[in-house]
Amino acid sequence: MAVSKTLQELADYLGGTLVGDGSRQIVGVASLDDATDSQITFLANPRYAPKVASTRAGAVILPPGAERHNHNAIMVPNPYLAFARLLTLFYVAPRAARGVMDGAHVGRNVKLGSEITIHPGAVVGDNVTIGDRVTLHPGVVLYEGVTVGDDVTLHANVTVYQGCRIGNRVTIHGGTIIGSDGFGYAPDGDGWYKIPQLGNVVIEDDVEIGANAAIDRAALASTVIGKGTKVDNLVMIAHNCVIGENCMIVSQVGISGSTKLGRRVTLGGQVGVAGHLEIGDNAMIGAKSGVPGNVPSGTIMSGIPAFDHREWLRASAVVPKLPEMKRTVAALEKRLRELEEKLESAV
């Protein structure tokens, strides 16, 4: 069903300041380029400020002090967050519970909450507990003893191994594996002896995990993904890692075993982190970096191996000049040799 709101209603919803016609009806959200006079748009990046003048939008979400060019406007401190909230308001439909559908398998001693949907092809093992308003899409597999909280969505082909715990308001996207064995082997002569992985994975509240990620169970105790953390597609988190609250882990990151991340840590795409390390609160690691040691809180690092980001920028600026520098050094060495030969012949 289409949603229509007045600008005044939207301003109240966002907690912003309305400038213009509060009775204007808005039916959707679009970009500065594509918005029509019945849609609202936003300016989050100053480089796009010139487009505000030419947009056809019925209203613009702007930061305080921005030029509105006679458009209706809602002024908010964080236009990007306001944009996200409006997308939820206009386009995210309420879920409709459908119960346990034909073709789903539910094991013994399973506790099911209210308003759930278990799609055909989903498998729920014995002694599983599922909270309220949970959706399990086709191909989801919950091994024995899994616990799932309220308002959880597991997309197609997610697998959660035995004994793992998923908190409230968690979303896990297709193909992700939670709780497979950690990569643990003891040297045994010329071979390797598998170390039984007896722990589990704990996913705390308000976590979102992308597609085809893998989070291994602990050898003992738990691998933990902290409250509010967001994990992108194709991320690997090894056994016994503890990820703090509200971290941001971007695609193709690999975190080796027993590493601990503090709160609000950001790891850029393809970062590799060695095992048994600690990365402090609010640290940021640039894309493709290799982290071989502990990282203090608040540090920004880049490079292989990772070091201070500002120093890395300076070092990176030198790299394209290395061929020229090599030629210059070779020429200087040649001149030095010639001078030495002249001095020797003059003696």
Swiss-Prot record:
SUPFAM superfamilies: Trimeric LpxA-like enzymes. The keyword Thylakoid does not apply. It catalyses: a UDP-3-O-[(3R)-3-hydroxyacyl]-alpha-D-glucosamine + a (3R)-hydroxyacyl-[ACP] = a UDP-2-N,3-O-bis[(3R)-3-hydroxyacyl]-alpha-D-glucosamine + holo-[ACP] + H(+). The active site is at residue 239. Its EC number is 2.3.1.191. Keywords: Acyltransferase, Lipid A biosynthesis, Lipid biosynthesis, Lipid metabolism, Repeat, Transferase. Pathway: Bacterial outer membrane biogenesis; LPS lipid A biosynthesis. One of its GO terms (cellular component) is membrane. The keyword Lipid metabolism applies. It is an enzyme of class 2 (transferase). GO terms for biological process: lipid A biosynthetic process. GO terms for molecular function: N-acyltransferase activity. Gene3D superfamilies: Hexapeptide repeat proteins, MurE/MurF, N-terminal domain. Belongs to the transferase hexapeptide repeat family. LpxD subfamily. Homotrimer. NCBIfam families: lipid_A_lpxD, PRK00892.1. Catalyzes the N-acylation of UDP-3-O-acylglucosamine using 3-hydroxyacyl-ACP as the acyl donor. Is involved in the biosynthesis of lipid A, a phosphorylated glycolipid that anchors the lipopolysaccharide to the outer membrane of the cell. This is UDP-3-O-acylglucosamine N-acyltransferase. It comes from Geobacter sulfurreducens (strain ATCC 51573 / DSM 12127 / PCA).
